[in-house]
Amino acid sequence: MDFLRTSLIVGLLVVSYLLVLEWNEDMSPQQQPVAQTPSVTIDSNGADSSALLNSPNTGELDTPETASKPATAEDSNISSTASSGKIITVITDVLRVEIDLNGGNVVEASLLQYPISLKNPTPLDLMQKNNGVYYVAASSLIGANGFDDSKNGGNPIYIAEKNSYSLQEGQDKLSVDLRTERDGVTIVKRYEFEKSSYSINVNFQINNQSDAPWKANFSAKLVRDKSPDPTFSGGFGAASFLGAVVSTPEKPYEKIDFSDMEESGPSGVKVNSSNGWIAFIQHYFVSAWIPLSNDTHTYQTRLRNGLYLMGFVDPEFTVEPGQTHNVGAKLYAGPKIMETLKEVAPNLDLTVDFGWLWLIAKPLYLVLEFIHDYVGNWGIAIILLTVLIKALFFHLSATSYRSMANMRRVTPEMQRIREQYGDDRQRMSQAMMELYKKEKINPLGGCLPMLVQMPVFISLYWVLLESVQLRQAPFFFWIQDLSIKDPYFVLPLLMGAAMFLQTSLNPTPPDPIQARVMKMMPIIFTVFFLWFPAGLVLYWLVNNILSIAQQWYITKKIENGGLAAKKIAS
């Protein structure tokens, strides 16, 4: 039975290690040298003229007649990054956005309240089109008469009243109007910003003063390269999914990684559905387009010349002569804060991905946030949540520790039985079972409670890993960022020492090999945790300390009870 217990623990350790390695292999962003950036010319929408953005009234992101046509310099809507249009800047209290007037699209979005690192206070660029990175948000009118369609002249050049716009003190909303006109049709592309919001409403107002009906499809897309997640810090377990997501009423959360786009070929991944949204997600942050109409949207992916596109196309609409029509969508570019995302769109909060144990993880997250609202320190909130979880499992843990203490108490008798029966395993097992029955010991009592608690521990791991609130959140003293490793490895070493102390309270396995494995486990875990985020290590350290206190109390109580019984018997 000692062998079974040890095998269970070692098996869990090995499986956890292999899962971490496999998960990092699948989820961690692949480094892509800048030299591999596509050399083709790209328009401000992030698309080549042959396929990505321009579609007629078929509601497709590319078309049969253009999909096979390679991008050429003669295509009317192609311009290199260097020849982009005039850039205007919009600044709110949380966002700094750059809009290219050649197409009127977002080519940079900086998150003002999220510095790159503690040492670099420069705001994090969620989107950008420089420094070897291509990540933009485009919205356009394509199809029969759409100004953005290549056959109609390609990207329109918009005019703005100012070069820069700022949300002033006391101002709750800021509107930025971009105007263009062609053949009697005037289009006003309006960006609407709100105070303390990462949501941007994008609206096209089409005023048709021509003599003919004007037809187009509204389209919105996110286009990016495969550049690595800037928030990825490396190390065991520190990766998060980097790729696309599509949400529909039928499938609220479907992840599409870059390899899926590569394997899907020219046709891409296509889904037709009303409502929903599309997004690119990374660790802590997300960009998403949310359609505002209840029409049937065609959600689709594309891969062209090293750029990955996730977008949607709405059905064709018609603006009669003398009429005005409005179409648009909502763009979100910001942190993955569950409460905020719920308000932006249904199921957008699922981008805070707690994994397959989300049913347990989500309540843990809500409790952690509730505690933080009172104490104001995420490190203290983690400690108090750990105490609360330990209290909930107090009786279950007590059962486990009581079983271990009883096993420890009868270890000398178990050793005597092994020596007495030697290689006669059948008689030895019989004698062991009689001993367990006599002493009322369940040999698996120390393992099963541990297994029952594992889902909670794993869920809390994901909660701490996915919570953007822990990013650059200080604890005390040298811990100034709970989302990265302890810079001096103090917490992992303390955790290793606590684990070593805890193993000394467990019954010593009679087999020398098992005993050596048990002694090595604290060292192995310490090495693992050296690169874990400090918040996770803090949780394990506090959990170990509480476990030691509970186990020591129960062990001493049982051992003292056994001594008292012996004195009475004598």
Curated annotation (Swiss-Prot):
A Gene Ontology term for the protein's cellular component: plasma membrane
Residue ranges, compositional bias (Polar residues): 31-60
Gene3D superfamilies for the chain: 2.70.98.90
TM region(s), chain numbering: 230-250, 378-398, 444-464, 487-507, 522-542
Chief place where the protein resides: membrane
CDD domains: 5TM_YidC_Alb3 (cd20070), EcYidC-like_peri (cd19961)
Stretch list, region Disordered: 31-79
GO molecular function, one term: membrane insertase activity
Any GO BP annotation: protein transport
Keywords: Cell inner membrane, Cell membrane, Chaperone, Membrane, Protein transport, Transmembrane, Transmembrane helix, Transport
Subcellular location: Cell inner membrane
Membrane topology: Multi-pass membrane protein
Signal peptide residues on this chain, from the entry's feature table: none
Pfam families documented for this protein: 60KD_IMP, YidC_periplas
InterPro entries to which the protein is assigned, alphabetical: Membr_insert_YidC, Membr_insert_YidC_N, YidC/ALB3/OXA1/COX18, YidC/Oxa/ALB_C, YidC_ALB_C, YidC_periplasmic_sf
Function: Required for the insertion and/or proper folding and/or complex formation of integral membrane proteins into the membrane. Involved in integration of membrane proteins that insert both dependently and independently of the Sec translocase complex, as well as at least some lipoproteins. Aids folding of multispanning membrane proteins.
Assembly mode: Interacts with the Sec translocase complex via SecD. Specifically interacts with transmembrane segments of nascent integral membrane proteins during membrane integration.
Family stated for the protein in its record: Belongs to the OXA1/ALB3/YidC family. Type 1 subfamily.
NCBIfam families named in the record: PRK01318.1-3 (NF002352), PRK01318.1-4 (NF002353), yidC_nterm (TIGR03593), yidC_oxa1_cterm (TIGR03592)
Protein name as catalogued: Membrane protein insertase YidC
Classification of source organism: Bacteria, Pseudomonadati, Pseudomonadota, Gammaproteobacteria, Oceanospirillales
